[in-house]
Amino acid sequence: MPIPDAANIDSRGVLLASSGFDQLKLSEDKSTIEVGAGNKWGQVYEYLAHYKLTVVGGRAGLVGVPGFLLGGGISFFGNEYGWASANVVQYDCVLANGDIVSSTP
């Protein structure tokens, strides 16, 4: 099932769509945010604008969060904070066997 306006694979591959994982949750102390893999940076920025906050994220709102971070992530804040991926506190991942694991730097 191709996804319009997205990078797609041919009919022999498996496409995992994460668009339903769109949760956004700011920590109580407002120092970290939980971002679901279905979000694009525009959604993250819009959510954080209500708190007058931002993140070391993508430079274009239509860019997906997971692909950007897994690719390193060049941000407008790169000179001050480095690559966006270096600012990730934790990844929660589902392994091929169904186990859920948390990975931290």
Regions found by a protein language model. Name each.
Residues 1-21, 37:
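Glycine-rich N-terminal segment of FAD-binding domains in flavoprotein oxidoreductases
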Residues 4-8, 26-27, 104-105:
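Short, solvent-exposed loop/turn and secondary-structure capping segments
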Residues 11-12, 50-54, 99:
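Loop/turn elements at helix/coil->beta-strand transitions in domains of secreted/extracellular proteins
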Residues 13-17, 33-36, 55-57, 92:
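Structural recognition of the beta-strand scaffold that forms the well-ordered cores
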Residues 18, 27, 48:
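Catalytic-core signature of thiol
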Residues 25, 57-105:
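FAD-binding subdomain of flavoenzyme oxidoreductases
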Residues 31-32, 39-44, 62-64:
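Short, structural beta-strand-to-alpha-helix junction motif
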Residues 44-50:
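Short active-site loop/helix that positions an aromatic residue
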